[in-house]
């Protein structure tokens, strides 16, 4: 299956966010800028977290925001936002979060597989820290193993 490309428009490094909602909105804006999703997809990701809690915080310092495939998803897309100051999502063990990934998947059949594939990129224990410290889009892509 493979992960979607990560264009420059889908990357925002050392951004500022007042809280987790603002961080997810930034990630959604990156997906929108890159043409992968409509602006409303950020609202869907936030709604999922409101409904199900901070399940998106999958590792210390890392959130993988996503929502179900729907009309807001234009094509498969990936976004990366690193935060200058980490924010809390309310996770009992993995807060605060400094790296927010956003994933938009067009096909319901590929949704869970793509979430799992992206999560597996962080089996390397220092990957979150390296991504948080990335200063260029190319560094972020290299850490994730994705193309532009």
Where are these regions (language model features)?
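Cytosolic covalent-transfer regions centered on His/Cys nucleophiles
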Residues: 1-148
